[in-house]
From Swiss-Prot:
Residues 1-2 are extracellular. It is a single-pass membrane protein. Residues 22-567 are cytoplasmic. Its main location: membrane. It comes from the Bacteria. The keyword Transmembrane helix applies. Disulfide bonds: none annotated. This is Septation ring formation regulator EzrA. Belongs to the EzrA family. InterPro entries: EzrA. GO terms for cellular component: plasma membrane; septin ring.
Length: 567
Protein backbone atom coordinates (compact mmCIF):
# COMPACT_ATOMS: atom_id res chain seq x y z
CA UNK A 1 0.00 0.00 0.00
CA UNK A 2 2.84 2.40 0.92
CA UNK A 3 4.69 1.71 -2.33
CA UNK A 4 1.54 2.47 -4.33
CA UNK A 5 1.23 5.89 -2.68
CA UNK A 6 4.86 6.66 -3.49
CA UNK A 7 4.38 5.72 -7.14
CA UNK A 8 1.20 7.80 -7.23
CA UNK A 9 2.93 10.85 -5.72
CA UNK A 10 5.90 10.56 -8.10
CA UNK A 11 3.55 10.32 -11.04
CA UNK A 12 1.60 13.39 -9.90
CA UNK A 13 4.87 15.29 -9.39
CA UNK A 14 6.05 14.41 -12.89
CA UNK A 15 2.76 15.60 -14.40
CA UNK A 16 2.90 18.90 -12.49
CA UNK A 17 6.57 19.49 -13.43
CA UNK A 18 5.81 18.71 -17.09
CA UNK A 19 2.94 21.21 -17.07
CA UNK A 20 5.00 23.97 -15.41
CA UNK A 21 7.97 23.41 -17.72
CA UNK A 22 5.80 23.49 -20.89
CA UNK A 23 4.16 26.70 -19.67
CA UNK A 24 7.57 28.31 -19.09
CA UNK A 25 8.76 27.31 -22.59
CA UNK A 26 5.60 28.77 -24.19
CA UNK A 27 6.20 32.03 -22.29
CA UNK A 28 9.74 32.13 -23.76
CA UNK A 29 8.27 31.62 -27.28
CA UNK A 30 5.87 34.53 -26.65
CA UNK A 31 8.76 36.73 -25.47
CA UNK A 32 10.84 35.98 -28.58
CA UNK A 33 7.81 36.58 -30.82
CA UNK A 34 7.31 39.98 -29.19
CA UNK A 35 11.02 40.78 -29.65
CA UNK A 36 10.79 39.85 -33.37
CA UNK A 37 7.74 42.12 -33.84
CA UNK A 38 9.52 44.95 -32.02
CA UNK A 39 12.49 44.67 -34.39
CA UNK A 40 10.20 44.68 -37.41
CA UNK A 41 8.54 47.88 -36.16
CA UNK A 42 11.80 49.82 -35.64
CA UNK A 43 11.70 53.23 -37.44
CA UNK A 44 14.49 52.35 -39.85
CA UNK A 45 12.49 53.37 -42.96
CA UNK A 46 11.79 56.77 -41.38
CA UNK A 47 15.49 57.27 -40.63
CA UNK A 48 16.44 56.26 -44.18
CA UNK A 49 13.88 58.73 -45.52
CA UNK A 50 15.86 61.52 -43.82
CA UNK A 51 18.92 60.51 -45.83
CA UNK A 52 17.01 61.11 -49.07
CA UNK A 53 16.86 64.79 -48.17
CA UNK A 54 20.64 64.97 -48.63
CA UNK A 55 22.50 64.94 -51.94
CA UNK A 56 21.97 61.35 -53.03
CA UNK A 57 25.29 61.02 -54.80
CA UNK A 58 28.69 59.59 -54.07
CA UNK A 59 29.29 58.35 -50.55
CA UNK A 60 25.76 59.15 -49.35
CA UNK A 61 24.18 57.13 -52.14
CA UNK A 62 26.48 54.16 -51.43
CA UNK A 63 25.68 54.24 -47.72
CA UNK A 64 21.94 54.58 -48.35
CA UNK A 65 21.93 51.55 -50.66
CA UNK A 66 23.87 49.49 -48.15
CA UNK A 67 21.55 50.39 -45.26
CA UNK A 68 18.42 49.80 -47.38
CA UNK A 69 19.68 46.37 -48.48
CA UNK A 70 20.54 45.48 -44.87
CA UNK A 71 17.05 46.43 -43.70
CA UNK A 72 15.32 44.64 -46.59
CA UNK A 73 17.35 41.52 -45.80
CA UNK A 74 16.32 41.72 -42.15
CA UNK A 75 12.61 42.20 -42.90
CA UNK A 76 12.29 39.86 -45.88
CA UNK A 77 14.66 37.04 -44.95
CA UNK A 78 16.01 37.02 -41.41
CA UNK A 79 12.86 37.82 -39.43
CA UNK A 80 10.73 35.31 -41.46
CA UNK A 81 13.39 32.70 -40.69
CA UNK A 82 12.95 33.53 -37.01
CA UNK A 83 9.19 33.07 -37.41
CA UNK A 84 9.70 29.60 -38.89
CA UNK A 85 12.08 28.65 -36.09
CA UNK A 86 9.46 29.68 -33.51
CA UNK A 87 6.88 27.41 -35.20
CA UNK A 88 9.44 24.58 -35.13
CA UNK A 89 9.94 25.16 -31.39
CA UNK A 90 6.18 24.94 -30.77
CA UNK A 91 5.96 21.64 -32.69
CA UNK A 92 8.84 20.21 -30.62
CA UNK A 93 7.03 21.21 -27.42
CA UNK A 94 3.84 19.57 -28.60
CA UNK A 95 5.83 16.36 -29.09
CA UNK A 96 7.43 16.77 -25.60
CA UNK A 97 10.92 17.09 -27.11
CA UNK A 98 11.92 19.65 -24.51
CA UNK A 99 15.70 19.43 -24.89
CA UNK A 100 15.61 20.11 -28.64
CA UNK A 101 13.07 22.90 -28.12
CA UNK A 102 15.23 24.57 -25.46
CA UNK A 103 18.31 24.41 -27.71
CA UNK A 104 16.37 25.91 -30.63
CA UNK A 105 14.99 28.73 -28.47
CA UNK A 106 18.55 29.59 -27.38
CA UNK A 107 19.61 29.80 -31.04
CA UNK A 108 16.63 32.04 -31.83
CA UNK A 109 17.53 34.38 -28.92
CA UNK A 110 21.15 34.63 -30.17
CA UNK A 111 19.92 35.42 -33.69
CA UNK A 112 17.56 38.14 -32.46
CA UNK A 113 20.39 39.63 -30.41
CA UNK A 114 22.56 39.89 -33.53
CA UNK A 115 19.68 41.44 -35.48
CA UNK A 116 19.16 43.94 -32.63
CA UNK A 117 22.80 45.01 -32.92
CA UNK A 118 22.56 45.25 -36.71
CA UNK A 119 19.45 47.47 -36.55
CA UNK A 120 21.04 49.64 -33.87
CA UNK A 121 24.15 50.06 -36.02
CA UNK A 122 22.08 51.11 -39.08
CA UNK A 123 20.20 53.76 -37.07
CA UNK A 124 23.43 54.98 -35.44
CA UNK A 125 25.25 55.33 -38.77
CA UNK A 126 22.27 57.14 -40.34
CA UNK A 127 22.13 59.59 -37.42
CA UNK A 128 25.88 60.08 -37.58
CA UNK A 129 25.69 60.95 -41.29
CA UNK A 130 22.78 63.36 -40.84
CA UNK A 131 24.30 64.86 -37.68
CA UNK A 132 27.69 65.36 -39.29
CA UNK A 133 26.07 67.18 -42.22
CA UNK A 134 24.15 69.51 -39.90
CA UNK A 135 27.11 70.13 -37.60
CA UNK A 136 29.51 70.66 -40.49
CA UNK A 137 27.14 73.16 -42.11
CA UNK A 138 27.01 75.19 -38.86
CA UNK A 139 30.72 75.00 -38.09
CA UNK A 140 31.92 75.81 -41.61
CA UNK A 141 30.30 79.24 -41.37
CA UNK A 142 32.05 79.92 -38.05
CA UNK A 143 35.33 78.84 -39.61
CA UNK A 144 34.76 81.11 -42.62
CA UNK A 145 34.28 84.04 -40.22
CA UNK A 146 37.41 83.11 -38.26
CA UNK A 147 39.38 82.83 -41.50
CA UNK A 148 38.20 86.26 -42.66
CA UNK A 149 39.18 87.81 -39.31
CA UNK A 150 42.62 86.22 -39.47
CA UNK A 151 43.20 87.48 -43.03
CA UNK A 152 42.01 90.93 -42.04
CA UNK A 153 44.32 91.03 -38.98
CA UNK A 154 47.30 89.87 -41.03
CA UNK A 155 46.64 92.57 -43.60
CA UNK A 156 46.09 95.36 -41.08
CA UNK A 157 48.96 94.52 -38.69
CA UNK A 158 51.36 92.76 -41.03
CA UNK A 159 54.36 94.66 -39.63
CA UNK A 160 53.79 93.15 -36.16
CA UNK A 161 54.35 89.64 -37.51
CA UNK A 162 57.76 90.36 -39.03
CA UNK A 163 59.16 87.74 -41.39
CA UNK A 164 56.55 85.24 -40.16
CA UNK A 165 53.84 87.15 -42.07
CA UNK A 166 54.68 85.49 -45.40
CA UNK A 167 54.37 81.96 -44.03
CA UNK A 168 51.16 82.90 -42.20
CA UNK A 169 49.82 84.17 -45.53
CA UNK A 170 50.68 80.86 -47.18
CA UNK A 171 49.01 78.85 -44.41
CA UNK A 172 45.83 80.97 -44.55
CA UNK A 173 45.70 80.56 -48.33
CA UNK A 174 46.03 76.78 -47.94
CA UNK A 175 43.23 76.87 -45.39
CA UNK A 176 41.05 78.81 -47.84
CA UNK A 177 41.39 75.97 -50.34
CA UNK A 178 39.86 73.63 -47.77
CA UNK A 179 36.61 75.60 -47.87
CA UNK A 180 36.37 74.82 -51.59
CA UNK A 181 37.21 71.20 -50.86
CA UNK A 182 34.40 71.08 -48.28
CA UNK A 183 31.89 72.48 -50.80
CA UNK A 184 32.90 69.93 -53.43
CA UNK A 185 32.60 66.98 -51.04
CA UNK A 186 29.23 68.19 -49.78
CA UNK A 187 27.94 68.65 -53.32
CA UNK A 188 29.10 65.11 -54.14
CA UNK A 189 27.25 63.75 -51.11
CA UNK A 190 30.48 62.80 -49.30
CA UNK A 191 29.36 64.21 -45.97
CA UNK A 192 31.66 62.12 -43.79
CA UNK A 193 34.73 63.11 -45.79
CA UNK A 194 33.49 66.71 -45.64
CA UNK A 195 33.27 66.36 -41.86
CA UNK A 196 36.94 65.34 -41.76
CA UNK A 197 37.79 68.48 -43.75
CA UNK A 198 35.91 70.61 -41.19
CA UNK A 199 37.77 69.04 -38.28
CA UNK A 200 41.15 69.48 -40.00
CA UNK A 201 40.32 73.08 -40.90
CA UNK A 202 39.15 73.82 -37.36
CA UNK A 203 42.41 72.52 -35.93
CA UNK A 204 44.55 74.47 -38.45
CA UNK A 205 42.72 77.78 -37.93
CA UNK A 206 42.97 77.27 -34.16
CA UNK A 207 46.73 76.90 -34.47
CA UNK A 208 47.08 79.91 -36.79
CA UNK A 209 44.92 82.11 -34.54
CA UNK A 210 47.00 81.17 -31.50
CA UNK A 211 50.21 81.87 -33.43
CA UNK A 212 48.95 85.29 -34.51
CA UNK A 213 48.32 86.13 -30.86
CA UNK A 214 51.75 84.93 -29.71
CA UNK A 215 54.02 86.15 -32.53
CA UNK A 216 53.80 89.93 -31.84
CA UNK A 217 54.55 89.34 -28.16
CA UNK A 218 57.47 87.03 -28.93
CA UNK A 219 58.89 89.47 -31.49
CA UNK A 220 58.61 92.25 -28.92
CA UNK A 221 60.60 90.15 -26.47
CA UNK A 222 63.26 89.07 -28.99
CA UNK A 223 63.67 92.38 -30.84
CA UNK A 224 63.27 94.89 -28.01
CA UNK A 225 62.94 93.72 -24.42
CA UNK A 226 65.60 91.00 -24.23
CA UNK A 227 68.27 92.90 -26.27
CA UNK A 228 67.67 95.98 -24.07
CA UNK A 229 68.23 93.89 -20.93
CA UNK A 230 71.42 92.41 -22.40
CA UNK A 231 72.67 95.91 -23.23
CA UNK A 232 71.84 97.03 -19.69
CA UNK A 233 73.75 94.07 -18.28
CA UNK A 234 76.75 94.87 -20.48
CA UNK A 235 76.73 98.53 -19.33
CA UNK A 236 76.38 97.51 -15.69
CA UNK A 237 79.20 95.00 -16.05
CA UNK A 238 81.58 97.60 -17.55
CA UNK A 239 80.63 100.18 -14.92
CA UNK A 240 81.30 97.74 -12.08
CA UNK A 241 84.68 96.80 -13.57
CA UNK A 242 85.58 100.49 -13.75
CA UNK A 243 84.67 100.81 -10.05
CA UNK A 244 87.11 98.03 -9.18
CA UNK A 245 84.88 94.96 -9.02
CA UNK A 246 86.58 91.69 -9.98
CA UNK A 247 84.12 89.93 -12.30
CA UNK A 248 86.32 87.64 -14.38
CA UNK A 249 84.73 84.55 -12.83
CA UNK A 250 81.34 85.51 -14.32
CA UNK A 251 82.59 85.32 -17.95
CA UNK A 252 79.98 87.97 -18.67
CA UNK A 253 80.97 88.94 -22.24
CA UNK A 254 80.93 85.34 -23.44
CA UNK A 255 77.64 84.68 -21.65
CA UNK A 256 75.99 87.78 -23.15
CA UNK A 257 77.09 86.74 -26.65
CA UNK A 258 75.54 83.29 -26.08
CA UNK A 259 72.25 84.98 -25.12
CA UNK A 260 72.33 87.14 -28.30
CA UNK A 261 72.84 84.01 -30.41
CA UNK A 262 69.95 82.38 -28.62
CA UNK A 263 67.73 85.35 -29.50
CA UNK A 264 68.69 84.92 -33.17
CA UNK A 265 67.71 81.23 -32.94
CA UNK A 266 64.38 82.26 -31.47
CA UNK A 267 63.74 84.74 -34.32
CA UNK A 268 64.48 81.98 -36.84
CA UNK A 269 61.95 79.72 -35.08
CA UNK A 270 59.31 82.47 -35.24
CA UNK A 271 60.00 82.92 -38.96
CA UNK A 272 59.37 79.16 -39.41
CA UNK A 273 56.25 79.36 -37.18
CA UNK A 274 57.84 77.05 -34.57
CA UNK A 275 56.06 79.10 -31.95
CA UNK A 276 56.02 76.64 -29.03
CA UNK A 277 59.77 76.12 -29.33
CA UNK A 278 60.29 79.89 -29.50
CA UNK A 279 58.17 80.40 -26.36
CA UNK A 280 60.33 77.86 -24.52
CA UNK A 281 63.52 79.64 -25.62
CA UNK A 282 62.17 83.04 -24.51
CA UNK A 283 61.19 81.64 -21.10
CA UNK A 284 64.69 80.18 -20.68
CA UNK A 285 66.30 83.48 -21.73
CA UNK A 286 64.26 85.41 -19.17
CA UNK A 287 65.35 83.09 -16.38
CA UNK A 288 69.00 83.21 -17.49
CA UNK A 289 69.00 87.03 -17.76
CA UNK A 290 67.41 87.29 -14.29
CA UNK A 291 70.18 85.03 -13.01
CA UNK A 292 72.81 87.36 -14.54
CA UNK A 293 71.20 90.36 -12.83
CA UNK A 294 71.30 88.39 -9.58
CA UNK A 295 75.01 87.65 -10.04
CA UNK A 296 75.86 91.34 -10.47
CA UNK A 297 73.61 92.29 -7.56
CA UNK A 298 75.27 89.63 -5.41
CA UNK A 299 78.66 91.18 -6.15
CA UNK A 300 77.37 94.58 -4.99
CA UNK A 301 75.89 93.08 -1.82
CA UNK A 302 79.08 91.07 -1.25
CA UNK A 303 81.14 94.28 -1.55
CA UNK A 304 78.94 95.95 1.08
CA UNK A 305 79.24 92.88 3.31
CA UNK A 306 83.05 92.82 3.05
CA UNK A 307 83.33 96.56 3.77
CA UNK A 308 81.10 96.19 6.83
CA UNK A 309 82.36 92.88 8.22
CA UNK A 310 86.12 93.39 7.92
CA UNK A 311 86.33 96.08 10.65
CA UNK A 312 83.84 94.19 12.82
CA UNK A 313 85.78 90.92 12.53
CA UNK A 314 89.03 92.70 13.28
CA UNK A 315 87.50 94.04 16.50
CA UNK A 316 86.05 90.62 17.37
CA UNK A 317 89.43 88.93 16.98
CA UNK A 318 91.19 91.60 19.05
CA UNK A 319 88.56 91.27 21.77
CA UNK A 320 88.83 87.49 21.64
CA UNK A 321 92.62 87.65 21.89
CA UNK A 322 92.35 89.90 24.96
CA UNK A 323 89.82 87.55 26.57
CA UNK A 324 92.09 84.60 25.79
CA UNK A 325 94.96 86.31 27.65
CA UNK A 326 92.69 86.90 30.64
CA UNK A 327 91.61 83.27 30.51
CA UNK A 328 95.24 82.15 30.35
CA UNK A 329 96.05 84.15 33.50
CA UNK A 330 92.92 82.81 35.19
CA UNK A 331 93.83 79.24 34.23
CA UNK A 332 97.35 79.63 35.68
CA UNK A 333 95.88 80.99 38.91
CA UNK A 334 93.28 78.22 39.12
CA UNK A 335 95.94 75.56 38.52
CA UNK A 336 97.66 76.65 41.73
CA UNK A 337 94.53 75.82 43.74
CA UNK A 338 92.77 73.19 41.65
CA UNK A 339 93.74 70.14 39.71
CA UNK A 340 92.75 70.48 36.03
CA UNK A 341 92.07 67.33 34.02
CA UNK A 342 94.35 66.71 31.01
CA UNK A 343 91.29 67.02 28.74
CA UNK A 344 90.56 70.51 30.12
CA UNK A 345 94.14 71.63 29.52
CA UNK A 346 94.03 70.16 26.02
CA UNK A 347 90.81 72.05 25.36
CA UNK A 348 92.47 75.34 26.32
CA UNK A 349 95.50 74.63 24.12
CA UNK A 350 93.08 73.86 21.26
CA UNK A 351 91.36 77.22 21.80
CA UNK A 352 94.70 79.04 21.64
CA UNK A 353 95.63 77.18 18.46
CA UNK A 354 92.26 77.97 16.84
CA UNK A 355 92.64 81.65 17.70
CA UNK A 356 96.04 81.84 16.00
CA UNK A 357 94.65 80.09 12.90
CA UNK A 358 91.64 82.42 12.73
CA UNK A 359 93.88 85.48 13.04
CA UNK A 360 96.10 84.14 10.28
CA UNK A 361 93.11 83.52 7.98
CA UNK A 362 91.76 87.00 8.66
CA UNK A 363 95.08 88.63 7.77
CA UNK A 364 95.19 86.62 4.52
CA UNK A 365 91.69 87.79 3.59
CA UNK A 366 92.67 91.34 4.53
CA UNK A 367 95.63 91.15 2.14
CA UNK A 368 93.42 89.81 -0.68
CA UNK A 369 90.94 92.65 -0.17
CA UNK A 370 93.81 95.14 -0.40
CA UNK A 371 95.18 93.47 -3.56
CA UNK A 372 91.75 93.80 -5.25
CA UNK A 373 92.24 90.66 -7.34
CA UNK A 374 89.51 88.48 -5.84
CA UNK A 375 85.76 88.74 -6.43
CA UNK A 376 83.83 90.11 -3.48
CA UNK A 377 81.41 87.18 -3.63
CA UNK A 378 84.30 84.77 -3.04
CA UNK A 379 85.67 86.96 -0.23
CA UNK A 380 82.19 87.06 1.31
CA UNK A 381 82.00 83.24 1.36
CA UNK A 382 85.37 83.06 3.14
CA UNK A 383 84.34 85.74 5.65
CA UNK A 384 81.07 83.91 6.38
CA UNK A 385 83.04 80.73 7.10
CA UNK A 386 85.40 82.76 9.31
CA UNK A 387 82.48 84.28 11.24
CA UNK A 388 81.02 80.82 11.80
CA UNK A 389 84.36 79.51 13.12
CA UNK A 390 84.84 82.57 15.36
CA UNK A 391 81.36 82.05 16.86
CA UNK A 392 82.17 78.39 17.48
CA UNK A 393 85.50 79.25 19.11
CA UNK A 394 83.86 81.92 21.30
CA UNK A 395 81.40 79.30 22.51
CA UNK A 396 84.20 76.85 23.36
CA UNK A 397 86.15 79.63 25.10
CA UNK A 398 83.12 80.62 27.15
CA UNK A 399 82.57 76.99 28.16
CA UNK A 400 86.19 76.78 29.35
CA UNK A 401 85.88 79.99 31.39
CA UNK A 402 82.63 78.72 32.89
CA UNK A 403 84.41 75.50 33.86
CA UNK A 404 87.13 77.48 35.68
CA UNK A 405 84.54 79.52 37.56
CA UNK A 406 82.60 76.36 38.36
CA UNK A 407 85.61 74.82 40.11
CA UNK A 408 85.50 77.45 42.90
CA UNK A 409 81.73 77.11 43.17
CA UNK A 410 82.08 73.34 43.37
CA UNK A 411 84.58 73.72 46.22
CA UNK A 412 82.19 75.91 48.22
CA UNK A 413 79.34 73.49 47.58
CA UNK A 414 81.56 70.58 48.70
CA UNK A 415 82.42 72.38 51.95
CA UNK A 416 78.73 73.11 52.57
CA UNK A 417 77.93 69.42 52.03
CA UNK A 418 80.72 68.44 54.45
CA UNK A 419 79.30 70.78 57.11
CA UNK A 420 75.85 69.30 56.57
CA UNK A 421 77.12 65.73 57.00
CA UNK A 422 78.99 66.71 60.15
CA UNK A 423 75.75 68.10 61.56
CA UNK A 424 73.95 64.88 60.64
CA UNK A 425 76.61 62.84 62.46
CA UNK A 426 76.40 65.14 65.50
CA UNK A 427 72.61 64.77 65.51
CA UNK A 428 72.95 60.98 65.47
CA UNK A 429 75.31 61.11 68.46
CA UNK A 430 72.93 63.50 70.28
CA UNK A 431 70.09 61.02 69.79
CA UNK A 432 72.27 58.23 71.22
CA UNK A 433 73.20 60.36 74.23
CA UNK A 434 69.58 61.38 74.79
CA UNK A 435 68.40 57.78 74.72
CA UNK A 436 70.77 56.89 77.66
CA UNK A 437 71.65 53.52 76.25
CA UNK A 438 73.87 51.35 78.44
CA UNK A 439 76.32 51.00 75.57
CA UNK A 440 76.79 50.71 71.82
CA UNK A 441 76.76 47.46 69.82
CA UNK A 442 80.09 46.69 68.21
CA UNK A 443 78.71 46.80 64.57
CA UNK A 444 77.29 50.24 65.29
CA UNK A 445 80.58 51.43 66.76
CA UNK A 446 82.37 50.26 63.59
CA UNK A 447 79.87 52.12 61.39
CA UNK A 448 80.35 55.24 63.52
CA UNK A 449 84.11 55.01 63.09
CA UNK A 450 83.70 54.51 59.33
CA UNK A 451 81.46 57.61 59.06
CA UNK A 452 84.02 59.71 60.96
CA UNK A 453 86.87 58.43 58.76
CA UNK A 454 84.89 59.27 55.57
CA UNK A 455 84.30 62.84 56.78
CA UNK A 456 87.98 63.20 57.62
CA UNK A 457 88.82 61.94 54.11
CA UNK A 458 86.65 64.65 52.55
CA UNK A 459 88.24 67.32 54.75
CA UNK A 460 91.70 66.08 53.76
CA UNK A 461 90.79 66.19 50.04
CA UNK A 462 89.58 69.78 50.46
CA UNK A 463 92.91 70.80 51.96
CA UNK A 464 94.97 69.42 49.07
CA UNK A 465 96.75 71.87 46.77
CA UNK A 466 95.96 71.78 43.90
CA UNK A 467 92.44 70.70 44.64
CA UNK A 468 91.28 67.62 42.73
CA UNK A 469 87.50 68.18 42.47
CA UNK A 470 86.68 64.78 40.92
CA UNK A 471 88.45 63.14 43.88
CA UNK A 472 86.60 65.46 46.28
CA UNK A 473 83.26 64.53 44.69
CA UNK A 474 84.10 60.83 44.99
CA UNK A 475 84.99 61.23 48.68
CA UNK A 476 81.76 63.20 49.23
CA UNK A 477 79.66 60.41 47.74
CA UNK A 478 81.31 57.81 49.98
CA UNK A 479 80.92 60.01 53.09
CA UNK A 480 77.29 60.75 52.27
CA UNK A 481 76.48 57.04 52.01
CA UNK A 482 78.31 56.27 55.29
CA UNK A 483 76.67 59.11 57.28
CA UNK A 484 73.16 58.40 55.96
CA UNK A 485 73.60 54.71 56.71
CA UNK A 486 74.79 55.53 60.28
CA UNK A 487 71.89 57.92 60.93
CA UNK A 488 69.34 55.34 59.79
CA UNK A 489 71.04 52.70 61.93
CA UNK A 490 70.99 55.08 64.92
CA UNK A 491 67.25 55.69 64.68
CA UNK A 492 66.62 51.97 64.24
CA UNK A 493 68.86 51.02 67.21
CA UNK A 494 67.26 53.56 69.57
CA UNK A 495 63.78 52.40 68.54
CA UNK A 496 64.71 48.75 69.16
CA UNK A 497 66.26 49.56 72.57
CA UNK A 498 63.27 51.64 73.69
CA UNK A 499 60.72 49.03 72.59
CA UNK A 500 62.77 46.25 74.20
CA UNK A 501 62.85 48.16 77.50
CA UNK A 502 59.11 48.93 77.40
CA UNK A 503 58.20 45.36 76.43
CA UNK A 504 60.23 44.02 79.40
CA UNK A 505 58.47 46.50 81.71
CA UNK A 506 55.08 45.46 80.28
CA UNK A 507 55.92 41.78 80.80
CA UNK A 508 56.89 42.22 84.45
CA UNK A 509 53.21 41.81 85.37
CA UNK A 510 53.46 38.15 84.30
CA UNK A 511 56.93 37.46 85.70
CA UNK A 512 55.82 35.88 89.02
CA UNK A 513 52.93 33.85 87.62
CA UNK A 514 54.64 32.42 84.54
CA UNK A 515 58.11 30.90 84.94
CA UNK A 516 58.54 30.78 81.15
CA UNK A 517 57.87 34.51 80.91
CA UNK A 518 60.32 35.18 83.74
CA UNK A 519 62.99 33.17 81.99
CA UNK A 520 62.38 34.91 78.65
CA UNK A 521 62.45 38.36 80.23
CA UNK A 522 65.65 37.59 82.16
CA UNK A 523 67.30 36.51 78.91
CA UNK A 524 66.08 39.70 77.21
CA UNK A 525 67.50 41.80 80.08
CA UNK A 526 70.83 40.00 79.74
CA UNK A 527 70.95 40.78 76.00
CA UNK A 528 69.96 44.41 76.67
CA UNK A 529 72.78 44.88 79.20
CA UNK A 530 75.19 43.49 76.58
CA UNK A 531 73.98 46.06 73.95
CA UNK A 532 72.21 43.51 71.72
CA UNK A 533 69.01 45.55 71.53
CA UNK A 534 67.62 43.86 68.43
CA UNK A 535 67.82 40.37 69.91
CA UNK A 536 66.63 41.64 73.30
CA UNK A 537 63.49 43.04 71.65
CA UNK A 538 62.85 39.79 69.81
CA UNK A 539 63.24 37.73 73.02
CA UNK A 540 61.00 40.05 75.11
CA UNK A 541 58.25 40.10 72.48
CA UNK A 542 58.30 36.29 72.23
CA UNK A 543 57.98 35.91 76.03
CA UNK A 544 55.09 38.38 76.40
CA UNK A 545 53.18 37.26 73.29
CA UNK A 546 53.24 33.72 74.74
CA UNK A 547 50.79 34.73 77.49
CA UNK A 548 49.15 37.81 75.90
CA UNK A 549 48.85 37.73 72.12
CA UNK A 550 48.87 41.28 70.66
CA UNK A 551 50.70 42.71 73.64
CA UNK A 552 53.55 44.07 71.47
CA UNK A 553 51.08 45.99 69.32
CA UNK A 554 49.77 47.72 72.44
CA UNK A 555 53.31 48.51 73.59
CA UNK A 556 54.11 50.04 70.16
CA UNK A 557 50.91 52.08 70.22
CA UNK A 558 51.64 53.50 73.68
CA UNK A 559 55.20 54.35 72.65
CA UNK A 560 53.99 56.15 69.49
CA UNK A 561 51.49 58.17 71.56
CA UNK A 562 54.27 59.20 73.96
CA UNK A 563 56.46 60.25 71.04
CA UNK A 564 53.64 62.36 69.60
CA UNK A 565 53.17 64.19 72.91
CA UNK A 566 56.92 64.85 73.20
CA UNK A 567 57.03 66.32 69.70
Amino acid sequence: MGMAWIVLLLGAGAIIYNHVYRKRMYREIDRLEEWKINLMNRPVPDELAKVKQLNMTGETEQLFERWRQQWDDIVAVKLPNVEEQLFDAERLLDKYRYRQARRLLGQIADGLRRLEEEVHEIIHEVNELIGSEEQSRAEIEELRAAHREAKKALLAYRYTFGSAADLLDVRLTEAEKQFQRFAELTEAGNYLAARDVVLTLKEELGRLTAMMEEIPKLLGECQTSLPAQLAELADGYREMEERGYILDHLHMERTLQEKREKIEQCLAMIHELRIEEAKQIVAELKEEIDALYDLLENEVLAHQYVQTEMPRLSGMLQELAAEAKETEAEALFVQQSYHLAPSDLEKYRSIEKQLHQLQKRFFLIQDRVAEAKTAYSLLKEELEQLVSQIDLMKEEHEQFRTMLQTLRKDELIAREKLDGMRKTLAEALRLVQKSRLPGLPEPYALELAEARRSLQAVAARLEEKPLDMPAVDQALEEAKAAVERLYERTVEMIEQATLAERTIQYGNRYRRRYPAVRKGLEEAEFLFRHYDYEEALRQAVAAVEEVEPGAFDRVQKLWQEDNSREQ
